Structures are given as C-alpha cells and as structure tokens.
Amino acid sequence: MYTIATATNCAHGSAGTPTSLAHTVSLAARAGASIGAHPSFVDREGFGRTAQDTAPLELRDQVLFQVGALDALCRGVGRRVQYIKPHGALYHAIMAGGAQGEAVFEASRLLELPLLLMPQSKWATYGEGFAERAYDGDLLRPRDQEGAVIHDPWLAAKQGVLLAARRNVHTICVHGDSPNAVVVAKAVRAGLETAGYDVRSFVA
C-alpha cells in the first residue's frame, strides 16, 4: 500500500501502539510517501468512529498530543508530520461545524500544519475526495447504511477520476482497512494515471 499511495494518514487516537505507529512511519518514509497525522476522538473501542461529547479545550489538547507524538516518531526517521487529516467521527464532527471544529482548527493553527478535509469545510486547507465511499449529495453516506463502501475496484477508480476533475479536490483517499484495499488503491491510481493525472503527494 505504501508504494501505491503518495501520502499516508497515520491513525493514533483510535488504534495501535507507539511501536506499531513507529513501524507505519518507517514504512511510509521508506516508500517516500508524505506523512499526515490522523487524530481522532479517544475511542479505541469504536475505532474512532463513535461521536464523543468532548469539550473543545480538551479536544484541542488531545489533537495536539496525538500529532505531537506522531511527529516525534517521524523525527526518528528524519521526517516530519506534513498535514492533519481528522479520522472517523471527529472528521464528521468538524464537517458539521461548531465548537469541536474550531478546536481542531485551533490545534492545526498552533502546530502550523494544514488541514485536509472535504472541500466544502470552511477549515479545509486542502480538499479531498473519497474513491471508495458512497456520497449522499456532498457528504459521505454513513457507514452503517447499505452501499456506504464501494468494494468494486473499477467503480472506485471511476469515482476517483470524476472527483479529481473538481478544482477544489487536491487528493483522493482510499481507506487501508478494507479487505481489498490494495487492489482498490492500485485501480484508483491506474485510473488517475490513465486519465492523464500526474499522481504525486499534494503536500510534496
């Protein structure tokens, strides 16, 4: 996966250990992929996909802590965190606007790191599209609804190319936790290259 993707979102509030995260960072660095922080609500039981009523100041500090820990591991391989992409329920909370979104934006401002979100977010520095997630309008279909995840590599590639054509989409996401994630990622990258796109990291 690391040789297919040009940027790697490293989750650390929702799963994993310092050792597994260090291994992920090492693999991404070896492949030449950009490294982004993928902070979440502190929700290991729900893999960061359960909404939390975390107070804004506490949430800001949680994000600062998670990104800071990842950056320390990046320094160990001569790299740095290059952007922040919130994970799961935190991502959706930010897209809804409000105080939790302000808290994450404040953390990104203090860290002087860009925020990667869906392009309609007022806090997005860079906009992203999702190749293997179904949309309802401009938002992602909730994962608990039928058809929320696109498993067909050809359909994911087709959607990735359509999303890339939008002026405000700078990068295409493929989740790495699906059973056929590598096959889908290969198809999406091949589709983009066939369509004439120069596939490289949006923060390189």
Language-model segments: residues:
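Active-site-adjacent beta->alpha loops and helix N-cap segments on the catalytic face
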Residues: 15-29, 95-102, 120-124, 182-184
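Active-site rim beta-loop-alpha module in soluble metabolic enzymes
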Residues: 120-165
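C-terminal domain-boundary segment and adjacent tail
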Residues: 185-204
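Glycine/small-residue-rich loop that forms an oxyanion/phosphate-binding "nest" at active or ligand-binding sites
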Residues: 44-78, 83
